[in-house]
Amino acid sequence: MKVAVIGGGPSGLVTLKYLLAAHHFQPVDPIEVQLFESEDRVGGTFSYRTYDRAELVSSAQLTTFSDYRWHDKSVDYLSAAEYVEYLEGYCDRFGLWPHIRLSTQVEKVERTGKGKHRITVSHDGQTSTWDCDAVAVCSGLHVKPNIPSIPGLDRVPVVFHSSEYKHVRQLGQNTNVMVLGTGETGMDIAYFSVTADSTKSTTVCHRNGFVIGPKRLPEIKLFGRVTSKTPGKALPVDLSRPYLFVNSYVHRKVRGTLQTTLSRWTVKAGSWLVTGTTRGFDQWVGSLPKDKYDESHYFYCKSTKAMPYISAPYRSHSWVHRLRSSIIQAVLPDTGSRKIDLAPWPEYIDEDGVVHFEKNSHPDSKVLLQERRFRPDVLVLATGYTQSFPFLGSDYCTPDHADQRGIWRTGDESVGYIGFVRPSFGAIPPLAEMQVQVWVLNLINRLPGPLVADDSYRLFSNPSGRIEYGVDHDMFAHRLALDIGAAPSFFQALAHGWQVTVFWAMGGTLNTKFRLVGPWAWSGAPRIICDELLDTVTGRRSTIELLTQLIMTAIVCGIPSILLFLADLLVALSIRIYQAISVVSSRPSKGDSAVTENRG
């Protein structure tokens, strides 16, 4: 079998690795694979669309692949440059380089009949083709910049997309900076702007609200004393969600909407408890409309450094807030006199370069109406990216039509889309690793069975929103593990010792956990769990944090699931007892049998 992989980012590299390794885990012949990358190095967005001081918002423990870890276990978040270094090391470790063709642009993918494909590529001005049996599209979500249509955009002296941002020097001297977009990149650039001595003012524009979520568990002060076991190095949030009763042993009626609703209310209550607001972590303004906050799922912005500068003018100073914060309060940075103005989305920019904002009911809109006209000198479009597949023929589907876990379309299994889902909390690379495990098994006819219909892991999409491919990271990873029989049970974890069992139950949903059993089981998985990952449970959390997590997990997921499982058991027993009684009562007695015989 021959397979082409398009794209040399994390998703493409992990796809290449599993295709090359398939014959070591399954009884199949070695697969011939070629990876085509248009740039001159691997890494994708992390190599070419990043900036100074850029840091991943997903933890190193979660983002790195199951069988190759970052060398420094004390590091929680990698810089973009460090992550590219990690990916290059991944290529070294698994011998991927001979199968990677850099500076090679895929011009066209077309079908040649009998289920095969032809890849047309260009390199150094030369065009060539490569025929194959399957194609893995791993070109990524962050390639083509999304440019909003705003009349008068060209009337601002300096305008550029965030993909072009490299250094704070680009924001100029003594400038009024406006950032469009409240995602991680937009918030990062706003933070760099407000803390730079070279800029005059910083304004961030949002469409219709956003939600801030910390990427680390907040450090808490109880009666003025910090309680964290590791001050300044709190546990990443994406490692804090336990596996037991959140993913494993969850009743079907709890999983999905009910589980998410309970979890959301828990998050809102926790946010109020430590920051005084339920809108988001220390988020006093810019919240989503109530109907969207309560009924739809949303993507958290995990870049929190800018939020204190936005919230400062809006924080409550009521006696309730003062009392609460004197008892319990998240540790927040001192912003001094610096602030970031929050504004609605621009409607248009007039001939004088003055921005006219859309009117809405948000408090920031009312504040702007009372202030002077705003004329930006620098405008940064942190408006994300759009999906584009110019190389695909018209008879190929796109990821939004891939109905099998977002990987392939039914009936067209030889074309896989890897890494085209976006988690709210989590990371794309580990989900891509789980997706490719499923796709490769299906490709070689080793999938345990048909994929069970299950959309509980999907996030509800906002009809007016740009992103419609959101998933809950932990639920999706667990679902993919179930698909291939790689989700370990309690007893399977226990077979590897108590340390693995503790991490299985209380640790985050990390892919190494899914290498304990199943078709991709790997003997090195228990060692990584014991040497590195167990520390996220036993070494990084205080007694208060562990007890709080146990109690909240039991309340939100554990108790409802246990009660429902018991109810199912009682119903099943009742049915069996009723059936047994019915059978007994329907049998003729011995006397009745004798009378019947005499009559005969």
UniProtKB/Swiss-Prot annotation:
A GO MF term: flavin adenine dinucleotide binding
Pathway named in the protein's UniProt entry: Secondary metabolite biosynthesis
Cofactors: FAD
InterPro entries assigned to the protein according to its UniProt record, in alphabetical order: FAD/NAD-bd_sf, Flavin_mOase, Flavin_mOase-like, FMO-like
Keywords: FAD, Flavoprotein, Monooxygenase, NADP, Oxidoreductase
Broad class of enzyme this protein falls into: oxidoreductase
Keyword Cytoplasm listed: no
Keyword Lipoprotein: no
Spans through the membrane: none
Entry's EC annotation: 1.-.-.-
Function: Monooxygenase; part of the gene cluster that mediates the biosynthesis of the indole diterpenes penitrems. The geranylgeranyl diphosphate (GGPP) synthase ptmG catalyzes the first step in penitrem biosynthesis via conversion of farnesyl pyrophosphate and isopentyl pyrophosphate into geranylgeranyl pyrophosphate (GGPP). Condensation of indole-3-glycerol phosphate with GGPP by the prenyl transferase ptmC then forms 3-geranylgeranylindole (3-GGI).
Family: Belongs to the FMO family.
Protein name in UniProt: Monooxygenase ptmN
Originating organism: Penicillium ochrochloron
